[in-house]
Amino acid sequence: MKFTPAKPPLTGETLESLTARLRERGEPAFRASQILDWVYKKRARSWDGMTNLPKPLRTWLDDTFDLMPATLVLNKQSADVTDKLLLELRDGSLIETVIIRAPQEGVGQDHSRKTICISTQVGCAMGCVFCASGLAGLKRDLSAGEIVAQLLQVCYREDALTPRAHMELASFDNIVVMGMGEPLANYDALIRALTILNADWGLGFGARRITVSTSGLVPKILQLADEPLGFRLAISLHGATDEVREKIMPVNKAFPLAKLLPAVKAFSEKHGRMITLEFILIDGVNDSLEQAEKLRDIALDLHAHVNLIPYNTVEGLAWKRPSITRQERFADVLRARRVSVTLRREKGHDIDAACGQLRLKTEKERQVLAAAKT
């Protein structure tokens, strides 16, 4: 499921591929570095802004490439300073990118830790019953250029807040590939995008600060382990037994815990880095003390960090988050055995921040407006 645009996005080109295209038209190799410097370091918003390029070359670039394949159509900020960016692609598809700010321990309310969460697909085919992203199914994969464009749009937004100087992407602490879609189901585009994100000629963001999340595609986890850049891994677990996990995550039928956990352990041992286990707490589904004990045992075996996430309500779904008391009781089971655990507090609960929810809400509003015009 791919979209073929009239012009490919420049944000999907590597230094090598762009150099090859330029050489085909007789341009010197250094032009590729100049162009990418304009895109990622100087953040030119138009071809005419690339003033050290000859005009014929700028005309060719305009005819050949799409400089920015994503347009910001909505920016919602929550009371806890979580920003959700809704982006429109060339075919009208909508995707979400989230900026999460949180205070560091010991520095009060200075929101100094910043994370960007990016999407890899329009919709999702995994069918997790609690998730807004997959309610309308999978529409298509994102191209590498569309994935990278999300980071540039974040840069544009941050630049606008500090107009005296360009914001460095390195000022963000982490980039997590945990937005709409299953990242490892769009593997080739993902790796190309992360290569561009990491490269010195690209956005220059360290691989150790990039986390790829998956619902559990075992063959792709093992493939990711062989990637030379060494990205971090997070597993969307959400159930500590097959019985619970299969009820809410269909992927568990193909890759049950007996297959998933050894693959995760192999990844961890190869890279020597702590894995993160993502666990959305859903009232009456996976928030029992028995689930907490099973999760504790899994985390201890994998030497993993556990990220507990109270469920963000999704319109049209009956699931809800447990009480704060129940959340703390669950976390205490892990803490008692010194499992590294984070219990996430409000992060965008007031701005449709459940993954994919803002997109669905906007699409419904567009459909209503379109129907009203007919």
Swiss-Prot record:
Alphabetized Gene3D superfamilies for the sequence: 1.10.150.530, Aldolase class I
Main location: cytoplasm
Family: Belongs to the radical SAM superfamily. RlmN family.
The reaction(s) this protein catalyses: adenosine(2503) in 23S rRNA + 2 reduced [2Fe-2S]-[ferredoxin] + 2 S-adenosyl-L-methionine = 2-methyladenosine(2503) in 23S rRNA + 5'-deoxyadenosine + L-methionine + 2 oxidized [2Fe-2S]-[ferredoxin] + S-adenosyl-L-homocysteine; adenosine(37) in tRNA + 2 reduced [2Fe-2S]-[ferredoxin] + 2 S-adenosyl-L-methionine = 2-methyladenosine(37) in tRNA + 5'-deoxyadenosine + L-methionine + 2 oxidized [2Fe-2S]-[ferredoxin] + S-adenosyl-L-homocysteine
Protein name per Swiss-Prot or TrEMBL: Probable dual-specificity RNA methyltransferase RlmN 3
InterPro entries listed in its UniProt record: Aldolase_TIM, Methyltransferase_A, RlmN_N, RNA_MTrfase_RlmN, rRNA_lsu_MTrfase_RlmN/Cfr, rSAM
GO molecular function terms noted in the UniProt entry: 4 iron, 4 sulfur cluster binding; metal ion binding; rRNA (adenine(2503)-C2-)-methyltransferase activity; rRNA binding; tRNA (adenine(37)-C2)-methyltransferase activity; tRNA binding
Enzyme Commission number(s): 2.1.1.192
Residues noted as binding [4Fe-4S] cluster in the record, renumbered to the chain: C124, C128, C131
PANTHER family assigned: 23S RRNA METHYLTRANSFERASE (PTHR30544), RADICAL SAM CORE DOMAIN-CONTAINING PROTEIN (PTHR30544:SF5)
Active-site residues, as the UniProt record annotates them: E96, C355
Binding site for S-adenosyl-L-methionine: G181, E182, S213, S236, L237, H238, N312
Annotated function: Specifically methylates position 2 of adenine 2503 in 23S rRNA and position 2 of adenine 37 in tRNAs.
Keywords: 4Fe-4S, Cytoplasm, Disulfide bond, Iron, Iron-sulfur, Metal-binding, Methyltransferase, rRNA processing, S-adenosyl-L-methionine, Transferase, tRNA processing
